[in-house]
């Protein structure tokens, strides 16, 4: 986003918060397309396309200029006058541009609030691994958890209203509203039966994440307000992302839901040990409170979604569980709080006692069965975990085939470096290693035994040291602590995208 600062300073329309003129600027679409190509090192094959060019952007801008009014053909979307026959290509281009433009107010407010400081820390907190140290420090002292499935789809007008707090330009909002309804007619992102937006990350990921985050930000703002009002809690400033108008609206909504004075109802939610974490399409609310308090939270959330967002939120989407007896899937890990029992012998005069100490510990395990299912879906093995060859890679060079399998092993070792027990990764490495050998043997029309015998020990060594290669990104091989760190949990702050093999849900 740093590239656009110079353009924004030259554009006087930004002084008044007008974003609509940026839609007609070619560099916006070029920057948006380049920004969408950025991928994490965990992605195996970044998708690069050459469909975005200045010629296409010029043609799109010309059509926007020449179109006096937007005509939507609900029954014959293939002959749309605005996008023409290349509607899919134009929709991808304009969605990237719109998402990039609407992000500008968020970015400007972030930069102004940070004052050029703390940006590196903010980027580190974007890591997928960043919540895990927080969970380790806090979840071991809590006992109750609300497992929440965030409801969707959402009505189109609610999405526009959510963005209205950030985008003050009415013209941009009108264009967004038109674009949402146009997608509704195309039946790509929106169900034709209902004028509601169904979040689908498979297409237009940038626009999807922008809309989804604005939608969830509206929902999560009430947690900050309740946290701020509680006298027992420390308040962390999130003024960059939230406006005061949010809190007053949620305050009135809370009064309507409980039909009583707000301050009289607030005491139900005062809890000094409440924590909230969101991941993918789920969120968890963990507390040390009683079951009565957790049921009140559940009732409030159900009523809040139904009253404020106007959608049916079934109570069955909120599950109340006890942490010591509950395991939940969190970012590709199977997480739980387990008790570690240790016997201590105590001697008092002539009497000896055995004391059983139970210590709670946040545990993160590799979900072996779902991960094998992901490998089977990617055609590395069958459903039973038996390795198979990868026929579509037999046309590649031997070095390319080995590098592809090795990168997958390294990425999995990198991602699951925080696992409490890493023995499950040995099974995954074995599957990938043997799948690589079968792929190479199939290419050379040989048996696996004969091929491994001719290849030597270097082939095995590269896969066995893939985890050490990942750890060496942080710790030097010559460091005396490297051998000890190798067996402990490590959380990285550079993992921004989740690997496809770990995203098994």
Swiss-Prot record:
GO cellular component: chloroplast
Key words, A-Z: Chloroplast, mRNA processing, Plastid, RNA-binding, tRNA processing
Transmembrane segments: none
Listed InterPro entries: Domain_X, Maturase_MatK, Maturase_MatK_N
Subcellular location: Plastid, Chloroplast
Domain of life: Eukaryota
Span of the signal peptide: none
Function comment: Usually encoded in the trnK tRNA gene intron. Probably assists in splicing its own and other chloroplast group II introns.
PANTHER family: MATURASE K
HAMAP family recorded: MatK
Stated family: Belongs to the intron maturase 2 family. MatK subfamily.
Protein name: Maturase K
Species this protein is from: Coffea arabica
